[in-house]
């Protein structure tokens, strides 16, 4: 029965859309007979989003210009130090981020490698204290004001 949700048996006609991303897929649902879904008012708008990597800065700007030519509001590029991002919303209201890695070094080593070495320690501190770890505070000092 095409009107039944396979995992729950719930009666709710839907369209299941898959977007291939490299070796993975993102799955989206359209539920035409359901009330319009809202957002979680307790979650800031910037928190829940999907980030996808693009090839280079030129491609990032090309996509930004294309989206703007279609009438989309695009924020950025935003300098995060180790990558630059643009942000926009899809027609269903999902926030999307496109990122391109940047070459950044810290004390003569790739910033990404330094962050990977610190990851476990930072996660442990976060889990124990609930406070943002200070291990990568140096990264924020490299950002444009």
Segments (PLM) and residue ranges:
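A short, polar/charged loop-to-alpha-helix boundary motif
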Residues: 104-120
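Generic beta-structure capping elements
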Residues: 22, 29-31, 101
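Short, conserved, surface-exposed binding loops centered on an aromatic residue
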Residues: 18-20, 39-43
């Amino acid at each position: 029965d095409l009107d039944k949700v396979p995992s729950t048996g719930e009666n709710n006609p839907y369209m299941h859309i898959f977007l291939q991303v490299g070796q993975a897929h993102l799955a989206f649902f359209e539920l035409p007979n359901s009330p319009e879904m809202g957002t979680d008012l307790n979650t800031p708008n910037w928190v829940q989003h999907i980030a996808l990597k693009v090839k280079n800065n030129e491609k990032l700007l090309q996509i930004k210009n294309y989206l703007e030519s279609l009438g989309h509001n695009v924020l950025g590029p935003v300098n995060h130090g180790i990558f630059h991002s643009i942000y926009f919303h899809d027609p269903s209201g999902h926030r999307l981020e496109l990122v391109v890695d940047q070459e950044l070094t810290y004390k003569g080593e790739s910033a990404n490698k330094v962050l990977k070495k610190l990851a476990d320690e930072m996660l442990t501190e976060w889990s124990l204290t609930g406070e943002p770890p200070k291990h990568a505070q140096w990264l924020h000092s490299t950002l444009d004001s």
